[in-house]
């Protein structure tokens, strides 16, 4: 210990080291504050620093040092009298010796007092609550509700039910939200919108779900324990099971996450019944399993059956379906913008229409897309091959992203084994199913109230999704009691009423209604949102569809009449949805990305079919919206883009339909002219429908018609010409070359319409010519009389003025 005496003391301390006898610790002074001991420890600290910068100094060996204790465990050395034998006592380091203020010579050290003052200033009210009368109360200052009757979870974290489920509370002067996994209050920026768990916990949760299942529970349990310790998660032990949250937390958590946990981690979820209240679904998650095969009306892409010669019969060229990707590898708050742009760029290659929605949580991308029937047929025939081509092919944007779930209409596929194998999953029988929605047309900018009928809807974690114009509309929903007949229910379906407060009055287009619960995701039913005139005409069109299904003139007047005709309304909904979607897509204002893409034949055919149907039904207001969007779309395109995408006959037919629709819309705006020439009332399509059938009802019935265009249409529509069956579904060249399989006849009532319009114009021209000739003859042969007549008319006009 001689080297210690040579070491200089601190600048402000002039203390000599104590004399040691044979380096025996028992010979140290027994004083409580022995400055020799202090200098000894201070020298140790300086030696540790000196060894880094200077070479070691040769000195006799030092006695072994006692391990350093933490400030919480350190205490002063007791005297020999207090400890009994001096040789048996254990030396502990003074807690002040590790303080930088004390080492620098600032005596006395005031750090403990400052720390205590800071703690008292930070949490004065919490300490007051802890030191109260012993009654367990909520830690929120403005609440302090009695939680003694609640479960152990709420008592441990000192939070009541209202504060735990509130969107935010004021705590320490800031808006905070309770994290049901951490058991603490965090600032609002730490949460995603609508979430009850902080972003860090959700990311940890997703990482746990992505781990491969292990047969032997030892390794998995060890990894789970390490991950839980690193994450400081709150674990409740009840009945020998470890659960990361209480049942109240699971009620507020994301249903899709809990549903997937049931397959991956544990079966210990607690069922519950959720109260029906207002939910904001602007950035809502929720994608469960799909519905049974027989419950998906949007995946039946056969043509709708025609009912005789009724004009309301309609079959769509490009049915609308749903494709959804549930991605587990991306954090909701860190979803790459570039990748999202790539996904939408890929979707923009689809031939007709699309509407995409992204929900956080497990990053769920849902797309409602309209494609030709032949493409849906190929996709339904071999879905695994097409999905493998897009997901598992190197270089694709989803390649190597790990596990994911793909919902393709009424089918479910999961990417397993580290993202290398795509497997189809069976659909649960108790999955929800929507029968119909009434009404299906709503005016933009006004409150929306609709009735939903379906099966297996009221289950735990039930929520409705109403998507429109790229976002989910906030709404409230409630159960509607179905009336009984003779003490027995006439229908097993359940009825719900959905109230949407407001919507954008300037946005028109399709909306989609879905429902999800713990059993999965239902089918979707489309709606249309437009202005008052569009809604009025859509109601008339819907009444014609009702007339085809209810020959005796039954009408829908109230919710009480719906229970006795659930099946009939379901059939009407599936029949009417094709026309409704085609009209809704047509009245939607085209986006900037869509105007940059060339128009293909499927779009031309769809526009021709929609225009033809609306012309026959004299729907002038809808025609005005469709024409405005179609003209805007055509003007922004290249002049030759229409010619390159389809044959001349389709282009000529489109121009004829646009001209005729423009005339009808113009006559509808001028009532006087419409009375002289009533639109569509004199159309020979209606009067002579047996002689000259409509294109709507007879697309493939005249094999000899349209010989000049038939070969080109068949060449484009044949599967071999567009590509092989194994070609990628989302390949741009294949999509653009695939068209409807129907033949377009040359004979139609459009020429009759054109001839009628031409004859009316010729008649007006003859009348005008006769009047001009009569006036010229009168001037030439009777100039005096004409002069007198002109003077008389002039005098009368001057007199009146």
UniProtKB/Swiss-Prot annotation:
The lineage of its organism: Eukaryota, Viridiplantae, Streptophyta, Embryophyta, Tracheophyta. Transcription factor that participates in reprogramming global gene expression during copper deficiency in order to improve the metal uptake and prioritize its distribution to copper proteins of major importance. Binds directly to 5'-GTAC-3' motifs in the microRNA (miRNA) promoter of the stress-responsive miRNAs miR398b and miR398c to activate their transcription. During copper deficiency, activates the copper transporters COPT1 and COPT2, and the copper chaperone CCH, directly or indirectly via miRNAs. Required for the expression of the miRNAs miR397, miR408 and miR857. Residues 1-23, 59-91, 203-258, 286-313 are annotated as: Disordered. This is Squamosa promoter-binding-like protein 7. Keywords: Activator, DNA-binding, Metal-binding, Nucleus, Stress response, Transcription, Transcription regulation, Zinc, Zinc-finger. It comes from Arabidopsis thaliana (Mouse-ear cress). Residues 222-233, 304-313 have a biased composition (Polar residues). The gene is SPL7. Zn(2+) 2 binds at residues 179, 182, 186, 198. Its main location: nucleus. Its cofactor is Zn(2+).
């Amino acid at each position: 210990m001689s080297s210690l005496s040579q070491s200089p003391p601190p600048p402000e301390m002039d203390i000599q080291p104590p004399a040691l006898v044979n380096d025996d610790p028992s010979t140290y002074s027994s004083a409580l504050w022995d400055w020799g001991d202090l200098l000894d420890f201070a020298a140790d600290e300086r030696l540790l620093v000196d060894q880094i910068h200077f070479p070691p100094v040769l000195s006799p060996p030092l006695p072994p040092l006692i391990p350093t204790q933490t400030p919480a465990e350190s205490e002063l050395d007791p005297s020999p009298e207090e400890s009994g034998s001096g040789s048996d006592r254990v030396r502990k380091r003074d807690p002040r010796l590790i303080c930088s203020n004390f080492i620098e010579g600032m005596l006395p050290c005031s750090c403990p007092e400052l720390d205590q003052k800071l703690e008292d200033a930070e949490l004065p009210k919490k300490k007051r609550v802890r030191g109260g009368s012993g009654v367990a109360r909520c830690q929120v200052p403005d609440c302090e509700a009695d939680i003694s009757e609640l479960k152990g979870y709420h008592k441990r974290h000192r939070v009541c039910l209202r504060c735990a489920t509130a969107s935010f509370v004021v705590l320490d002067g800031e808006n905070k939200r309770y994290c049901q996994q951490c058991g603490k209050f965090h600032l609002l920026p730490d949460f995603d919108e609508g979430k009850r768990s902080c972003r860090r916990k959700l990311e940890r949760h997703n990482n746990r779900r992505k781990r491969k299942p292990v047969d032997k529970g030892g390794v998995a349990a060890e990894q789970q324990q390490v991950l839980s310790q690193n994450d400081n998660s709150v674990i409740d032990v009840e009945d020998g099971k470890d659960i990361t949250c209480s049942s109240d937390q699971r009620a507020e958590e994301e249903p899709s996450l809990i549903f997937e946990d049931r397959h991956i981690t544990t079966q210990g979820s607690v069922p519950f019944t959720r109260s029906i209240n207002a939910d904001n679904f602007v950035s809502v998650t929720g994608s469960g399993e799909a519905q049974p095969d027989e419950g998906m009306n949007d995946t039946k892409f056969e043509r709708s059956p025609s009912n005789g010669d009724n004009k309301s019969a309609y079959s769509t060229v490009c049915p609308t379906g749903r494709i959804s990707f549930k991605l587990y590898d991306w954090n909701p708050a860190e979803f790459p913008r570039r990748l999202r742009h790539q996904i939408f760029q890929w979707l923009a290659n689809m031939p007709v229409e699309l509407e995409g929605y992204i929900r956080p949580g497990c990053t769920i991308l849902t797309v409602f897309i309209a494609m030709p029937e032949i493409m849906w047929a190929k996709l339904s025939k071999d879905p695994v091959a097409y999905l493998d081509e897009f997901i598992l092919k190197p270089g694709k944007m989803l390649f190597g992203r790990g596990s994911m779930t793909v919902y393709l209409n009424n089918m479910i596929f999961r990417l397993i084994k580290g993202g290398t194998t795509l497997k189809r999953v069976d659909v649960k029988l108790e999955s929800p199913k929507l029968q119909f929605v009434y009404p299906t047309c709503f005016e933009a900018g006004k409150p929306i109230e609709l009735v939903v009928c379906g099966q297996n809807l009221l289950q735990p974690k039930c929520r409705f999704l109403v998507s429109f114009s790229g976002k989910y509309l906030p709404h409230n929903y409630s159960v509607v009691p179905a009336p009984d007949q003779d003490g027995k229910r006439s229908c097993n379906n359940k009825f719900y009423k959905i109230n949407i407060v407001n919507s954008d009055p300037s946005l028109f287009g399709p909306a989609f209604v879905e429902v999800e619960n713990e059993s999965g995701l239902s089918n979707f039913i489309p709606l249309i949102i437009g202005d008052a005139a569009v809604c009025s005409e859509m109601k008339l069109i819907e009444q014609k569809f009702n007339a085809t299904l209810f020959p005796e003139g039954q009408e829908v007047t109230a919710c009480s009449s719906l229970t006795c005709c659930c099946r009939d309304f379901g059939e009407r909904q599936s029949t009417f949805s094709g026309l409704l979607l085609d009209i809704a897509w047509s009245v939607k204002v085209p986006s900037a990305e869509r105007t940059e893409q060339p128009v293909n034949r499927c779009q031309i055919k769809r526009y021709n079919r929609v225009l033809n149907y609306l012309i026959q039904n004299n729907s002038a207001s809808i025609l005005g919206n469709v024409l405005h969007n179609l003209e805007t779309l055509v003007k922004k395109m290249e002049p030759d883009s229409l010619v390159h995408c389809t044959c001349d006959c389709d282009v000529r037919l489109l121009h004829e339909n646009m001209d005729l629709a423009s005339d009808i819309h113009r006559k509808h705006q001028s009532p006087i002219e419409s009375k002289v020439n009533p639109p569509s009332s004199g159309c020979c399509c209606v009067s002579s429908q047996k002689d000259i059938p409509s294109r709507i009802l007879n697309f493939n019935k005249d094999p000899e018609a349209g010989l000049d265009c038939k070969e080109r249409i068949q060449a484009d529509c044949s599967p071999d010409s567009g590509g092989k069956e194994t070609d990628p579904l989302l390949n741009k060249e294949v999509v653009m070359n695939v068209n409807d399989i129907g033949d377009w006849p040359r004979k139609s009532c459009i020429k009759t319409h054109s001839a009628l319009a031409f004859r009316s114009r010729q008649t007006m021209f003859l009348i005008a010519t006769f009047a001009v000739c009569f006036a010229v003859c009168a001037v030439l042969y009777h100039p005096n009389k004409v002069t007198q007549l002109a003077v008389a008319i002039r005098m009368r006009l001057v007199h009146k003025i």
